């Protein structure tokens, strides 16, 4: 796992077309912005797991 330190307003890039920007830090919460092409799905981890679980159930 790559671990990076960023400040508010700073970004990191994934590949050529995904940008993640730190928008705000308050206590133990970090607000981030994600810019990605429309064909790239972006989900919070817990939502992704729900989507995957529903798809798995539908295949049974």
Swiss-Prot record:
Single GO MF descriptor: mRNA 5'-UTR binding
Subcellular location: Cytoplasm
Highest taxon listed in the record's lineage: Bacteria
Main localization (coarse): cytoplasm
GO BP terms: mRNA catabolic process; negative regulation of translational initiation; positive regulation of translational initiation; regulation of carbohydrate metabolic process
Keyword set includes Flavoprotein: no
Protein keywords: Activator, Cytoplasm, Repressor, RNA-binding, Translation regulation
UniProt-listed InterPro entries: CsrA (IPR003751), CsrA_sf (IPR036107)
SUPFAM superfamilies recorded: CsrA-like
Any Pfam family hit: CsrA
Cellular component terms per the entry's GO annotation: cytosol
Any coiled-coil regions, as ranges: none
Family stated for the protein in its record: Belongs to the CsrA/RsmA family.
Subunit structure and binding partners: Homodimer; the beta-strands of each monomer intercalate to form a hydrophobic core, while the alpha-helices form wings that extend away from the core.
Described purpose of this protein according to its UniProt entry: A key translational regulator that binds mRNA to regulate translation initiation and/or mRNA stability. Mediates global changes in gene expression, shifting from rapid growth to stress survival by linking envelope stress, the stringent response and the catabolite repression systems. Usually binds in the 5'-UTR; binding at or near the Shine-Dalgarno sequence prevents ribosome-binding, repressing translation, binding elsewhere in the 5'-UTR can activate translation and/or stabilize the mRNA. Its function is antagonized by small RNA(s).
Name of this protein: Translational regulator CsrA
Gene symbol of the encoding locus: csrA
């Amino acid at each position: 796992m790559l671990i990076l330190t960023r400040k508010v307003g700073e970004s990191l890039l994934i590949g050529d077309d995904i940008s993640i920007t730190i928008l705000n830090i308050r206590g133990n919460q970090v607000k981030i912005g994600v810019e990605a092409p429309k064909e790239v799905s972006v989900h919070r981890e817990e939502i992704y797991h729900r989507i995957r679980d529903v798809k798995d159930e539908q295949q049974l």
